[in-house]
Amino acid sequence: MQAIILAAGMGKRLGELTKGNTKCMVTVNGISLIDRLLTQLCSVNLARVVIVVGYEGEKLQEYIGKRYDTKLKIEYINNPIYQQTNNIYSLALAKRKLVEDDTLLIESDLIFDDSLFSMILDDSNPNVALVDKYEAWMDGTMVHIDEENNIVNFVPKEAFKYEHIDSYYKTVNIYKFSRDFSINTYVPFLEAYTKSLGNNEYYEQVLRVVTLLDNCNFKALTLNGQKWYEIDDVQDLDIASVIFSEKKMKYEKYHKRYGGFWRFPQLLDYCYLVNPFFPTKRMKDELRANFDVLLAGYPSGMYVNSLLAGKYFGIKQDYIVLGNGAAELIKIIMEDYVSDKVGIIYPTFDEYPNRLKSEQIVGYVPQNKDFAYTADDLMAFYADKHIALLLLINPDNPSGNFISKSDILRLAQWCKEQETHLIVDESFVDFTTDGVSNSLLSNEILEANPHMMVMKSISKSYGVPGLRLGVFATSNTELIARMKKEVPIWNINSFAEFYLQIFGKPKIRNYHPIHD
């Protein structure tokens, strides 16, 4: 058994990282791809490793040096016209080597679990491609397989169709060819293909032709959760650095992303409470049906969107400002309109204190294991603290502490007497037992408490965190008017606006997102 590694490409999409290095010299968590690969091959009983080099080939050979000589016999083949050719030509240059032994064919821009080599080598089939069920991050050649794991056809990138993704498997770009297969099938077709269609093609195109033969014995070996990633650009590199990091570092790397976890299909996110039952199928279908129009059209400005937000919650347009998520509005209110001391209950949603200077914060930490507190606890603690603003997240994030609506109104009256403003963040109120009846978003309540402000994320109970919607409401119309001037003219996108628009339809509006 031998290994052939294709490493001639320029890796242009990696930008500065490959300006003076080959793609396989790029590091993931401090280890280069080529070092990781060669170290993995050291555990395999190989007669030799053949590396086809091209771009910065001398630099790669110098980098590898003699560090692996005691465990691997490494040979090099140079592709001098790597700029005008693709990997089919690199493999064609190695065809004489290919027919001399059984072969592991590997692309050099991969990172993968150590177990993959033993998996493919232990498989009894002589000609095998490692494949993985299609996921959204995958790009490149796909295959269809039958119930006996035969590869029935290769699907090149240009023939990819999203309506077929349920049947696609992605090639991992690790193959096992028997010597007999190389001599009698692959190399003859490789020679014919390059002669007919040229050298600027992919070696998988030859396999696509081969699988059309009646007696082609080429199997797929499907991964079962083993990790791997193909690194073509800096985003791939970033994702791979998360997937292949140690446990402690992995948590830190996930945490600093704040979202975008669709890039990690196996990850379950328990950090954010989001309603999985809303929007309704009808709403999603309507959003899909209007996708092209929304993608190509500008959203409305604040006038229309505050009208929609007011209709959404049944309050006056002049009492509400719509944000690109509550986070946009938190930043504005905390940085631009708060200069004195602020009462904050800990632990809390960090976005609020992060927008303040440390000397502004007067923290209250409940002295019990549940971090529970009441309105009376807050009034007692802050009675002599001379705060200008009290922040209450209700239900609390992250403790879950909940103060009833009647007690919040009592707290609001106390704040009024203390000449203290009150912000109530009720982003999670719909998850409480009585749901929306606990909300403070009503004209009557806001008008009776002009010193009180209500913040609400339209992500959690409405199941649309990706749309980035949030509102800030108060009967202090001067404050609302100033905040509307603070946000960009188009601070939400067309999809978010359309969601607000169709939510007002009776058949949808009557569907309670949490309790029905």
Predicted segments with their positions:
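N-terminal glycine-rich phosphate-binding loop and ensuing alpha1 helix
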Residues: 1-58
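Conserved beta-loop-beta/alpha segment of the NTase-like Rossmann-fold superfamily
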Residues: 71-141
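Short loop-beta-helix segment that forms the pyridoxal 5′-phosphate
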Residues: 72, 298-299, 310-332
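Conserved core of the sugar-phosphate nucleotidyltransferase
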Residues: 113-197
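Active-site pre-lysine segment of PLP-dependent enzymes
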Residues: 119-123, 373-384, 398-461
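PLP-dependent aminotransferase class I/II
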Residues: 171, 301, 451-516
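N-terminal "arm"/small-domain region of PLP-dependent enzymes with the aminotransferase-like
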Residues: 242-297, 385
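PLP-dependent aminotransferase-like
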Residues: 335-392
